[in-house]
């Protein structure tokens, strides 16, 4: 876009220099004005001609030569001429033929078509030049970036002839022109040119008048109607104002209008620390450059720092949801890993249970084959217990009779006792043990589990020493009692000492 603007500005400046060097005669200007009026009165014919010229194009809006244009050789000619008619028409306009050969460019006017193919009479071009046509016979040519920003013209409103002003779309960019190649012209030169033409020719004002405003002041604050974006420090507005796009697809949508208006001068960027990583180089506007670099284009080159608020919030919500899903997946994976560990433990438990079942089966097989002999087998026949019945089958221990052990310790065999009980009409539930199996009665003068009776033996003295040591008496008293125990000799004295010791401990 910047290169296209530079190309338009350069062509316009060269046309102004050519007009200043060789002013156009009054007759030629009157004829040009008359032709322009005819074109304005018959817009349908002009649109049909331009449709034929742009047939076969790629769909982009292209300029069309109007009343005064430039041929390939640079000679101006009337619209609709062929290449061979340019010299004759140049003589009619009052321009010498030598100047036509020497000049490389001429005055060029553009027609802009909307996306439906209709010609637009008034349009703000890419180089910020507004051409308005109306019925009042007054046409104003305004130029300059700041002028377009400061103008009060509403781009979205129709002109006096009923044609709506729309965006002309994108145009091919010429790679042969750059912004640095554009030369500037002072506003005084343009006014001087118009003054010389009015004095030398004294032609009457017919049709429309060309009014050129003074050169724009770059230091003056811009107060555009709906600026797209404000600059920094000097508060320079960007090119153009907000225009609704008529394209349904393939066009970059316009930025929305900011609801907040600047209340004061912008913040200066001179105190920005050098360590800031996201501060980009900003090229300031200079009168020598003739144009400015759009801040929006710089932002686009930096990777798209301008996001729509709603789209940015939606992207953040999506990122948050994805992070939550990722966290849930991590939890599920950790639980699955714990399940895998439990699965391994369950498998090991199953193996242990199988081994235990095998061991139990082996023990059952051994127990079923082992035969336990009854005690007393093979005794002497003269032994009183020899009459006890012996299991002839030697059954396993599981099926052993629990009453067989009693027959070995009782005085009479079980069979004889059962027969005796049946003859007496009653059964005896109790049997008498043999004397060798009977316990002796407990003696009161001997030590037993019932009580301790001291005697002259060393065991009795050891028991008394243990009683003294385990008591809660003081150490001095324990040592005194140990000395007394060593001095006692008789059994009676030892018994009295034991009784005295138990009384002292029980206190």
From Swiss-Prot:
GO terms for biological process: DNA-templated transcription; viral genome replication. Keywords: Phosphoprotein, Viral RNA replication. One of its GO terms (molecular function) is molecular condensate scaffold activity. Belongs to the morbillivirus P protein family. Homotetramer. Interacts (via multimerization domain and XD domain) with polymerase L; this interaction forms the polymerase L-P complex. Interacts (via N-terminus) with N0 (via Ncore); this interaction allows P to chaperon N0 to avoid N polymerization and non-specific RNA binding before encapsidation. Interacts (via C-terminus) with N-RNA template (via Ntail); this interaction maintains the P/L complex anchored to the nucleocapsid template during the sequential transcription. Interacts (via C-terminus) with protein C this interaction allows C to associate with the ribonucleocapsid. The N-terminus consists of a long intrinsically disordered tail. The central part contains the coiled-coil multimerization domain (MD). Forms a four-stranded coiled coil structure. The C-terminus constitutes the alpha-helical domain (XD) that binds to the nucleocapsid (N-RNA complex). This is Phosphoprotein. The lineage of its organism: Viruses, Riboviria, Orthornavirae, Negarnaviricota, Haploviricotina. The gene is P/V.
């Amino acid at each position: 876009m910047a290169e296209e603007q530079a190309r338009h500005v350069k062509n316009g400046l060269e046309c102004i220099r050519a007009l200043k060097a060789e002013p156009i005669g009054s007759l030629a200007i009157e004829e040009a004005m008359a032709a322009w009026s005819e074109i304005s009165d018959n817009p349908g014919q002009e649109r049909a001609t331009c449709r034929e010229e742009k047939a076969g194009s790629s769909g982009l809006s292209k300029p069309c030569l109007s009343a005064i244009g430039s041929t390939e050789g640079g000679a101006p000619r009337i619209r609709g001429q062929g290449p061979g008619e340019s010299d004759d028409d140049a003589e009619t306009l009052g321009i010498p033929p030598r100047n036509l050969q020497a000049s490389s460019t001429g005055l060029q006017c553009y027609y802009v078509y909307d996306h439906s193919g209709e010609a637009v009479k008034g349009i703000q071009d890419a180089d910020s030049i507004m051409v308005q046509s109306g019925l009042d016979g007054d046409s104003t040519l305004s130029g300059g970036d700041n002028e377009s920003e400061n103008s009060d013209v509403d781009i979205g409103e129709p002109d006096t002839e009923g044609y709506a002003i729309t965006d002309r779309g994108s145009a091919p960019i010429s790679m042969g022109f750059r912004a640095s190649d554009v030369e500037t012209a002072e506003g005084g030169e343009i006014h001087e040119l118009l003054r010389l033409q009015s004095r030398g020719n004294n032609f009457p004002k017919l049709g429309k008048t060309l009014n050129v405003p003074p050169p724009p002041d770059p230091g003056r604050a811009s107060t555009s109607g709906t600026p797209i974006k404000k600059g920094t420090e000097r508060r320079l507005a960007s090119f153009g104002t907000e225009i609704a796009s008529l394209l349904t697809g393939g066009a970059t949508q316009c930025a929305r209008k900011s609801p907040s208006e600047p209340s004061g001068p912008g913040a200066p960027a001179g105190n920005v620390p050098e360590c800031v990583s996201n501060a980009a180089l900003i090229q300031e506007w200079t009168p020598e450059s003739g144009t400015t670099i759009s801040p929006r284009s710089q932002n686009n080159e930096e990777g798209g720092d301008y996001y729509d608020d709603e789209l940015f919030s939606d992207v953040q919500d999506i990122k948050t949801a994805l992070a939550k899903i990722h966290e849930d997946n991590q939890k599920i994976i950790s639980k699955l890993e714990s399940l895998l560990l439990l699965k391994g433990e369950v498998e090991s438990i199953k193996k242990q249970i199988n081994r235990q079942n095998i061991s139990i089966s082996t023990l059952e097989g051994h127990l079923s084959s082992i035969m336990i002999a009854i005690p007393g087998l093979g005794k002497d026949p003269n032994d009183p217990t020899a009459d006890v019945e012996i299991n002839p089958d030697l059954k396993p221990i599981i099926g052993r009779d629990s009453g067989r052990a009693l027959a070995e310790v009782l005085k009479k065999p079980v069979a004889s006792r059962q027969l005796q009980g049946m003859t007496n009409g009653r059964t005896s539930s109790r049997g008498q043990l043999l004397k060798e199996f009977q316990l002796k009665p407990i003696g009161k003068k001997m030590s037993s589990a019932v009580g301790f009776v001291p005697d002259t033996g060393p065991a009795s003295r050891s028991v008394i020493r243990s009683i003294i040591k385990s008591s809660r008496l003081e150490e001095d008293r324990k040592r005194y009692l140990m000395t007394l125990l060593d001095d006692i000799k008789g059994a009676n004295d030892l018994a009295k000492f034991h009784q005295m010791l138990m009384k002292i401990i029980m206190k």
